[in-house]
Amino acid sequence: MSFSSIVSKFLRYLEIPAKNRTAVNFLRNPDLQPIKSANQTWGFWSNLAYWGAVSFTAGTWMSGSAALSVGLSYPETIVSFLLGNVLTIIFTMANSYPGYDWKIGFTLAQRFVFGIYGSAFGIIIRILMSIVNYGSNAWLGGLSINMILDSWSHHYLHLPNTLSPSVAMTTKQLVGFIIFHVLTALCYFMKPYHMNYLLIWSCVATCFAMLGIVIYLTKNAHGVGELFTSTKSTVTGSKRAWAWVYMISYWFGSISPGSTNQSDYSRFGSSNLAIWTGSVCALLIPATLVPIFGVISASTCDKLYGKQFWMPMDIFDYWLTNNYSAGARAGAFFCGLCFTMSQMSSTISNCGFATGMDMAGLLPKYVDIKRGALFCACISWACLPWNFYNSSSTFLTVMSSFGVVMTPIIAVMICDNFLIRKRQYSITNAFILKGEYYFTKGVNWRAIVAWVCGMAPGLPGIAWEVNNNYFHDSGIVKFFYGDSFFSFLISFFVYWGLCVFFPFKITVRHDDKDYYGAFTDEEARKKGMIPYSEISEEEIRAYTLGECYTTGHEYKPESSDNESPELIKTSSENTNVFEIVHQKDDEKHSFSTTQQVV
């Protein structure tokens, strides 16, 4: 057997089973199609829990430690976080509309903006961010697992470290990390739109756990401690102002990967009102309160124990080490269980499933959401997440770097949706190679240029954040401090300007029929589409299931006044290829385009 035949056989083995995919090509996958209206079940509480799960985590709890690096007082840091939440709401909700309007996820939205081939650019960046975020969340999840195991066994609490001193983790931490990965991997066998119940329960449980910790510490310390109220800002004047800007930018940067792929989950919403109210409440209330809880706990611990414990896991480790009582063990178990649930919910929704959706767009023939999520879990080890939490400055660097890369993508997507396309997209054209979103050789170079222009000025700032001795250019540093503002404006207006001076032709505004069952009959008619219930099963198969590409069936839809797509069969030796020919006439002009369907 030749090497090429071995490779071909291996690739066929890796293909998604035929029952789980609709067509054998690089553009189609069931996970990429719009969500059917029956699965759009996320109401207010589900949307609140989706973003609430991000806040009710150990990472958000300890985020107040960032104030140590920039010199702001803790009250100032909390206010800057509140302003950062407002910025996050603006960017996130503006970037939600592809999911609102057309029930599609981030992957198809990237095809609309960056092109059929160019979409890989934004998708790969989002995958890389998810992998880093996955490792970070999983590490904290492993520490939460250890809270549970510590409460079960005094021996495990004092488990000897058998790893090399040069490794920034212990044997016990490694055990918890592995267990968390295994438990999380089991959740990838459910559909993303079914995990809203896990999100809701984890938010409720962790909220009560956090409240319990803060109330207990505050009661024993007879107040919130002097650290919270008396800590003064160590910077003044313009440095203080830029520190404010930095904390606002950092706060959005830490959440920017989730804001970028917001349409992945906004498409599950039962109504726009539920999406708006749930998301806004979550991004305002828990996202502001949880950092306050973290600061209060560190302040009270400093008064009670002479140490500032920023991680809730460290608090319970201290309690169990000094008093392995039944009460301490019960508290460690239940709080550890709650934090484990919250870390799992955040990791699964914002990292695992997000990567699965993205990879399904890159390699739909070989990867579905489940496989992509498991890949993300495996590769997340490579980013060495145990190094992220060695110091507050390292944590800050990791979190702030997300925004430098992701904010320009958000800016381009928002500009394209509102100013260029006017919130009108053709879903079927996202599965057509040389169709509406082919642009120039499959790439919208305008979007690429706009992203580079917004991203590049922030890269030196990341290097400076890692090592302040690289250079002392205050302009570069200040740009990095306000990157979330500056990069957004640069990319937004560069893309808009390029589209004005180098326009591309928009020939298809939106589909004339709801081929994917994404809307109710009433919603479809409001959008000027023929409802799914009024389309023949034969036509639905032709447009969505790809049946005609394997059976050789030829389908010709009925013509309409405005547009008459005609499915024409052309043959090659081994393959049947179909083309959709669009013909449109009005009083001012007429044109026809031929688009290859794959």
Curated annotation (Swiss-Prot):
Gene3D superfamilies named among the record's database cross-references: Hydantoin permease
Domain of life: Eukaryota
Activity at various pH: Optimum pH is 3.5-6.5.
Induction: Expression is controlled by the transcription repressors SUM1, HST1 and RFM1.
Membrane topology annotation: Multi-pass membrane protein
InterPro entries: NCS1, Pur-cyt_permease, Uracil/uridine/allantoin_perm
GO cellular component terms, A-Z: plasma membrane
Intracellular or extracellular location(s): Cell membrane
Record has Membrane as a keyword: yes
UniProt modified residues of type Phosphoserine: S560, S572
Any one biological process term the GO annotation gives: nicotinamide riboside transport
Main localization category: membrane
Keywords linked to the UniProt accession: Cell membrane, Membrane, Phosphoprotein, Transmembrane, Transmembrane helix, Transport
Keyword flag Transport: yes
Gene Ontology molecular-function annotations: 5-amino-1-ribofuranosylimidazole-4-carboxamide transmembrane transporter activity; nicotinamide riboside transmembrane transporter activity; nucleobase transmembrane transporter activity
Sequence intervals crossing the membrane: 48-68, 71-91, 112-132, 174-194, 197-217, 241-261, 273-293, 372-392, 395-415, 447-467, 484-504
Similarity-based family: Belongs to the purine-cytosine permease (2.A.39) family.
Functional note: High-affinity pH-dependent nicotinamide riboside transporter which also transports thiamine with low affinity. Involved in 5-fluorocytosine sensitivity.
Protein's name in the database: Nicotinamide riboside transporter 1
The species this protein was found in: Saccharomyces cerevisiae (strain ATCC 204508 / S288c) (Baker's yeast)
Gene label: NRT1
